[in-house]
Curated annotation (Swiss-Prot):
InterPro entries reported in the protein's UniProt record: SfsA (IPR005224), SfsA_C (IPR040452), SfsA_N (IPR041465)
Family assignment from sequence similarity: Belongs to the SfsA family.
Taxonomic classification: Bacteria, Pseudomonadati, Pseudomonadota, Alphaproteobacteria, Hyphomicrobiales
A Pfam family: SfsA
Name listed for the protein in its UniProt record: Sugar fermentation stimulation protein homolog
Example GO molecular function: DNA binding
Species whose genome carries this gene: Bartonella quintana (strain Toulouse) (Rochalimaea quintana)
């Protein structure tokens, strides 16, 4: 996924109210940008860190600049939580998930379960329906190990419950963790920050829900899914 138009460099001053951040470009005055991420962004919000912004020439937007990338531990990290679905589709189409090959149709945002929407529903005349949920990942504490979640996620736990029900109906259900950074070789569940999610992950795994993780190359030119990473489940 290319950034068009190109991104603009800046320095982060602070993030607040989840959706907003104050930033500074060169010798310009401090100004406010939108943050397309409602999560904690643990470990990514460091004052004076290098960041990159996208520009949106839209009169309906209150803030025309939007935070896209932050630099953390000398690595570029994508923080836009609206991108993982696009990246997931690229990963499927580029053959990074051969387990999902062969489906004729990929439907987006389909209703299922109890007041939920699945990110992707894969359908075929021969293959069983496959319900695919996508999660954004950008949290790292240990070297080379990406983790999810970075805070308690009741919504994420509910999604696992819904996927378990799908498997019980004789269909395929899968969770794809899209890692918007390259400095990792493995992925794991962050059990200390959300034990409930960890237990539900274990139950889903035993129930037959499929789990995959893909990392991305992040640059100021674009973000691209590049490799599968192993999922560690201790």
């Amino acid at each position: 996924m290319l950034f068009i138009p190109k991104l603009f460099p800046a320095k982060l001053i602070r993030r607040y109210k989840r959706f907003l951040a104050d930033v500074k470009r060169d010798d310009q005055d401090i100004f406010t940008v939108s943050v397309p991420n409602t999560g904690s962004m643990l470990g990514l919000i460091t004052p004076n860190s290098n960041i990159w912004l996208s520009y949106h020439n839209n009169s309906k937007r209150k803030y025309v600049y939007q935070l896209e990338i932050v630099e953390a531990n000398n690595s570029l990290v994508g923080i836009n939580t609206t991108l993982p679905n696009k990246l997931a589709l690229e990963a499927i189409q580029n053959g990074l998930l051969p387990e999902l090959n062969g489906y004729k149709t990929i439907l987006k945002e389909q209703r299922y379960g109890t007041q939920s929407r699945i990110d992707f529903l894969l359908r075929d005349d021969i293959l069983p329906d496959c319900y695919l949920e996508v999660k954004n990942v950008h949290f790292i504490r240990q070297k080379e190990l990406a983790e999810f979640p970075d805070t308690e996620t009741k919504r994420g736990t509910r999604h696992l419950e819904e996927l378990i029900k799908i498997v019980q109906q004789g269909k395929r259900a899968a969770m794809l963790y899209m890692i918007q950074r390259e400095d990792c070789s493995a992925f794991t569940i962050c059990r200390d920050l959300d034990p409930t999610y960890g237990r539900k992950f274990d139950l889903a795994l035993k129930s037959g829900v499929e789990f995959y993780a893909v990392k991305c190359h992040v640059s100021v030119e674009g973000i691209f899914p590049i490799h599968r990473v192993k999922i560690e489940n201790d």
